[in-house]
Amino acid sequence: MESRGLTLRSRTRRARPQISAPKPISGPLPPNSKSTDSGQGNNVSQAVSRERIPTNGATSDLVKRRYSTRYNQAPEFDASAPPVPGLPAAASKYGGLGPPEASKKPSSDSSGPPQVDLNALRDPSLPVDRSNLLANATEEEIEEYQNNLRKVRNRTSTDLQQNVYQNRTQFIKISKEAEKLKGEMRTLRTLMAELTTALGQTAIGNAPNPMSPTADDWVPKRNANRSSVANLESMWNVQLQTLWKTVEGSQKFLPVAPGRHIVMETGQWVELDSATWKPRRPVHIVLLNDHLLVAAKKRKRVDASNHRGPVPTKLVAEECWPLQDVDMIDLGANMGTGAAREEAEERGIANAINVRVGSKTFTYRHDKRDSSDKGELLATFRKAVEDLRRTLRSESDTAIKPTDGFGYAGVKHSVSQKLDLNASDASRDKPEVRIDVDGKQQNLRWVDGQVDELDIDIALQRFEEAVSGIERLRKLARGLKGNSYAQQIINSKVDERAARLASVLSRALADTHSFLNATKTNVTWLTRLGFEDQAREAYLKARSDVISKRVRACVFEGDLPLYIFQVSYVYFTLIKNTINIYQQCFPAVLTSACIKWAKHHLDGFNALLTRQLSSVQRGTTVWQKCIDIVHEHADSLTEVGVDFVDLVAKGLDLHDNGGEKPQMTRSESLISGLADAARDHAF
């Protein structure tokens, strides 16, 4: 049988070709590529992990081509090339092909509760009505947002108030510096004017003839004699020290003061007796810019056995007066005519002057009858007095300026007036009035600075510092006995601040009258300021208002004993507490005012009690119950040492009508009549 014939025997089968799994590639898969069989993922991964024998064939090549993808090679970029610039911000406003940009604002779900944006609130063009910040917020988040806004508002208000106080302090400092600069400029003008005058007089006295060939040599000499302002002040100090050495006892009359200097010094004067015109003693007259000093010539004590020649003399200060208190009269101007004039000329009255200081009168005569010292002294004295008056007037104008104010506007107005440096020219060319403060010389600007500090303490309610400052300035004013002008200015300023502070303390006392410590503190401050009467009146008035308010709160609802209980409790409890606090806050000498106040309110209570019991039968149970309640409450006054038992319910007790038997009411009399009728019927 041929081999190619049909047979039932099994033949050897050829192995079928296996399709190899897809080989992994180095590049990423396309986004649209998907796995052909997701259910066989695990089998494929296991098949890939095993090593397989590569098979060759057309079928495998076709399958490889089917499951393979070719990618182009990535371009090579230069690392040194600059980066690509970003898109401008304006490009985001226009729509494009790209996906829409996600919103930058965090949602309420992801970012939590809304926060207060201070930068947005500072924007004046903020559209408040269009804001959608709280559109999706819960009620708790809205309340929290409101609380945050309130905190921001309170913090802003506090910052604004602190800025106002800081600006006020800066304004005050600026005003002080301006006043100080103004005074320095005034002093500089004065010194320069006096220096110019002195140099002019020196030039006139030392200038040679212009026709002289040495005229050119005089110019450098004049320039060499010029001195600075500081040297002029030093020269004045040297003059005073020389005066102290020359005139014994002059230092106690003329201590060192800024601007004090000698204007004129003249000798060869004789003091005359005002009644007999006889010479008493030789004197030496020294005229300063603010005082007039008279020194007497006295002999020195020397040993007569060892001394030969004339006896030496010394100058001793006898009289010294403020220049504004002195009047100097020329006696030679009113000598008359005829024999009286001849007699006056023989006595030397033509060269005599009369000095008046208050009620005292002094007469001085110059020894040289043909000398011009008297006329020069009179002219220099008048000029010095006029200069001193102009200086005092300048200080008065500066002090009268309204520089006081509590608010921001008041300070601004005061500073604007202080900065007026173009005041009258006549008030800025002379030295200022000086006062002695703890051994140091101060001017009135120092007083203004202390007053400004008082204003700040009062505005900030630093009462202890304000009261201490007022006491210090008052003590300073009491010590200025020789300077009535400065004393008057200081007292006027201090009294104004004291009255203002007393009004503030009185309001505080009326607000805290029920508290012992606060009342005692306020009363102590008012007492130190000298307003004890105002403190007493404010306290008692506040307590009277409380009594009236509490009594009006008691309402009568038909139960008379209950109403009397309420009213009497209010009256006597408040009176007792008032007396108790008053005794601890005020001195014992003022207790009578409190007792008088208590008696006044007790009379008011008696009038109210009489009015309420006018419709009740005297002696009834209701009557007696009301009287007992009143006396029980009145006994509480004995705890503070006051006994008003005889004055309480005066005229309403039973013994006031002679102790007559209590009368029965209509109902009681009716019941009594029925009982009597029943008893008679039984008999």
UniProtKB/Swiss-Prot annotation:
Assigned GO CC terms: exocyst; transport vesicle
GO biological process, alphabetically ordered: exocytosis; Golgi to plasma membrane transport; protein localization; protein transport
Coiled-coil ranges (or none): 128-199
UniProt-annotated stretches for the region Disordered: 1-128
Domain of life: Eukaryota
InterPro entries linked: Cullin_repeat-like_dom_sf, Exo84, Exo84_C, Exo84_C_1, Exo84_C_2, PH-like_dom_sf
Pfam families: Exo84_C, PH_EXO84, VPS51_Exo84_N
Localisation per UniProt entry: Cytoplasmic vesicle, Secretory vesicle
UniProt keyword list: Coiled coil, Cytoplasmic vesicle, Exocytosis, Protein transport, Transport
Bias kind Polar residues: ranges: 32-48
Subunit structure: Component of the exocyst complex.
Function comment: Involved in the secretory pathway as part of the exocyst complex which tethers secretory vesicles to the sites of exocytosis. Plays a role in both the assembly of the exocyst and the polarization of this complex to specific sites of the plasma membrane for exocytosis. Also involved in assembly of the spliceosome.
Family, similarity comment: Belongs to the EXO84 family.
Name this protein carries in UniProt: Exocyst complex component exo84
Native organism: Aspergillus fumigatus (strain ATCC MYA-4609 / CBS 101355 / FGSC A1100 / Af293)
Gene transcribed to yield this protein: exo84
